[in-house]
Amino acid sequence: MAPSRNGMILKPHFHKDWQQRVDTWFNQPARKIRRRKARQAKARRIAPRPASGPIRPIVRCPTVRYHTKVRAGRGFSLEELRVAGIHKKMARTIGISVDPRRRNKSTESLQANVQRLKEYRSKLILFPRKPSAPKKGDSSAEELKLATQLTGPVMPIRNVYKKEKARAITEEEKNFKAFASLRMARANARLFGIRAKRAKEAAEQDVEKKK
């Protein structure tokens, strides 16, 4: 590997006939063609289902650095499916991914994904298992004629940014200490239980003193 940026200049100590062990990438163009053919074969195999696979939930990226962005998750939580009125076993059969390990930590995420599931159900064209005997919930014959295979992602997720208009900075904003406030908030969250315990012990001691 060539030296990059302001690091130490390396002195590679090669042994073991390294020239016979150089990793080459001559298969890259053929690999690209193979991947494309595999995608096309899968799309033909699963038709008329969406080529990109089942619908995925909207999740927020972890850590402070990335939590302003949303992306596709692994699967919908059991709570989201329950609120949307879809059985977990049925969900997988109609192109909805399920992840039983996932937990909803906010009402907003739950509501957003429930809304996503309801919108998906309203747009879904469901083929009957037996064309001669359609069941309740299956799409009508007119809808089945309109069905085409979706090639892109199912209901793509977009990051929406709200642009704010330029305005004058207030005195309160100038005096606000962002880093100190974050440190204080973290400290308060960390020490919440200890402080509650101390307050309880102090109250008990006061009661004993009064006796």
UniProtKB/Swiss-Prot annotation:
Domain of life: Eukaryota
Residue numbers bearing the N6-acetyllysine modification: K16, K177
Any one GO MF annotation of this record: structural constituent of ribosome
Xref: Pfam families: Ribosomal_L13e (PF01294)
InterPro entries in alphabetical order: Ribosomal_eL13, Ribosomal_eL13_CS
Residue(s) carrying Phosphoserine: S52, S77, S106
Glycyl lysine isopeptide (Lys-Gly) (interchain with G-Cter in SUMO1), cross-linked positions: K174
Keywords: Acetylation, Cytoplasm, Isopeptide bond, Phosphoprotein, Ribonucleoprotein, Ribosomal protein, Ubl conjugation
GO cellular component: cytoplasm; cytosol; cytosolic large ribosomal subunit; cytosolic ribosome; synapse
Similarity remark: Belongs to the eukaryotic ribosomal protein eL13 family.
Role according to the record: Component of the ribosome, a large ribonucleoprotein complex responsible for the synthesis of proteins in the cell. The small ribosomal subunit (SSU) binds messenger RNAs (mRNAs) and translates the encoded message by selecting cognate aminoacyl-transfer RNA (tRNA) molecules. The large subunit (LSU) contains the ribosomal catalytic site termed the peptidyl transferase center (PTC), which catalyzes the formation of peptide bonds, thereby polymerizing the amino acids delivered by tRNAs into a polypeptide chain.
Protein name: Large ribosomal subunit protein eL13
Organism field: Rattus norvegicus
